[in-house]
Amino acid sequence: MSFSSLNFEIKESHKLFISPFDRGFIFGDAVYEMILCIDGRCIFLEDHLARLKQSLASIKLIPDFKEKNLEDEINRIANVNDAPFQAIYVQISRGVQLIRNHLPEENLSPTVFITSIKIDDPSDRHKGISALLKDDERWLKTDIKSTSLLANVLNKIEADSEGHDEVILHKGGFLNEGSVSNLFLFINDDLHTPSLDANILPGVTRAKLINLAEANNINVIQRIIPLSEIDNAQEVFMSSTTKGVIPVVRIIGSKFDTDKPGDLTLRLREIYLQEIYQT
């Protein structure tokens, strides 16, 4: 049995109902966060809440609740579901508007939905994934964690249909990120990642990995990375909230092809796992 929260009321998940006139349903007029929880502890919660706050500000959605109330409700959902490994999904839409109109009515009450998704232990050893290079066809405001994810869905469908796990997106000859992850490359033992002005989401895990790498004497370079450089990368990995460090062993559309995750990637992965288990 799972429990979710709708507008700060917790019920069994199957007993919750959202209006079909909610702007999140009609327009995708909503933002979200995904938070890793281990044994009831929400990892990097403050960072996720800060990004959620920024997303809300970017779409000019003013919450009618206190941030502390949201934080408390997230923790309640994590604890009431009592699973060792969870992803807590938080979605806030602009609210219910009975007459469909692109222009929001004034004084709408946001819809706040929080649920728990059971996930695998992030420490499960990962053999590495296969990724597909693809032109980035998403909208330009990728810094907003919007629920309007149709382009991402289509990317995942395409990758899966061709037997791959993820898509690595590029635009105008430069690397961006994955469809649901950030991108890292080891080049000459330095860790390279597309900078935030490369049309990417400011990933919480990405930021933590940069800090951890620097603290462990790994030189990190954030820059605009030409697509061609992926051919000569020593190692490639992706990062996400629920999976942490995801080694990439093959990239279709490039010369990058290896038989196993690289040592530098695995070292950083272990450092990251130590961080999340002691946070």
PLM regions with names:
Residues 80-92, 99:
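Ordered, amphipathic secondary-structure segments that act as subunit-interaction surfaces
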